[in-house]
Amino acid sequence: MGMGRVSFRPTNAEGIILMIRANLIDYMGSDLSIVNAARVSFGKRSSFGGRVGGPNVLKEEDEKLVHYLAKHKHMSPFGHCFASFHIKAPIYVARQLVKHKFLRWNEISRRYVSDPPEFHEPELWRSKATDKKQGSGPALEDQDVHIGTTQRLVAMLYESMLAKGVCEEQARMVLPQNTMTEWYWSGSLDAFADMCNLRTKNDTQWETRDLAFQIDAEMQNLYPIGWLALTRGIQ
């Protein structure tokens, strides 16, 4: 079922533009798709209904089947549900998430695009973790860290290089890790569940965790039974 493209200027309740954002743009299938993909092995087919809660609620035996499939890691039926997201995030976040090999990824390329760069600046600067080699600790007491001047200088340098005739694929080398990028990210229900199960853990980077929780919310809305079965309810 297609949903069409969504406006890509999302805001929070205060009207502030969210710099890191996952927008659902398309999806296919439902919880019933999981059930019927499994039951076809026996030449069977189910349908929605039969329980209180609305026309698109699984029958009790079908809900139990979905949880059984997830518990025993019978993943192929979950592969018949598919979603696509349009993601906007800084490069340093994107380079962590691209490692999930079963999700399809097509990203904007500054070999071809020379639009003025946008930069991500966190709301809070976090302290260095003291008990591990990676990660971060609580917010710094001294938040007097300013990168705006550097960002403006980098943007000016980038634009001047292009103006002098330097090709896009070389001019991009001066852009920092907090430059915003965007990509289409598509995959099956089980592939996104695997990503979210990993990226929502407490020891993951906050920025990637934030993005994973946004995807979690969309997938939970689309596939409430299947998503819960695969993620055990992300907290």
Can you say where each PLM-predicted feature lies in the sequence?
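Family-specific signature for flavin-dependent thymidylate synthase
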Residues: G2-Q235
